[in-house]
Amino acid sequence: MTKKFRVVIGSDDAGFQYKEILKKQLQSDTNVESVVDVGVDASSKTPYPDVAIAAAQMIADGKADRALLICGTGLGVAISANKVKGIRAATAHDSYSVERLVLSNNAQVLTFGQRVIGIELALRLAKEWLTYHFDESSASAQKVALITEFENKDQ
């Protein structure tokens, strides 16, 4: 049996509309155990780094398995999430990139830009993303280990 994911979702005000739609899909997905929303709400203007870092920290702390983050471009939340030790986040707006995000890079965080892709594509990509699981015995595992090794060096 495949493990279900504990997913955290978040956005800034530029991604709020998509976050709400995507959250509903995640909550009904059979690959999802739970969904935690770290903001924002309809009236908030929380800066995207706060939301992205909170979501990424939940993964780093073992409280979530994956995060889906949305801002205007998807780039700001990816950069912010990547500042949390142990997190690999990337923006992906096509099926192949979503697949490789997990299978080649073991990234836990997928980010979207509400101003970049349509909602139907975002829904499709989020659903696909939940079907992928990183294989620790794959050829990519050594490359991911090198990233982790560098991250853990005393600098």
Which residues does each PLM region occupy?
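Helix-adjacent hinge/juxtasegments
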Residues: 51-91
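Short, solvent-exposed amphipathic alpha-helices that sit
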Residues: 17-28
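Short, high-confidence coil segments that cap the C-terminus of an alpha-helix
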Residues: 32, 63-65, 106
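A short beta-strand-loop structural module common to alpha/beta enzyme folds
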Residues: 33-45
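Short, conserved beta-strand edge motifs with alternating hydrophobic and charged residues
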Residues: 10, 35-38, 67-71
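C-terminal binding/interaction regions
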Residues: 3-17, 95-155
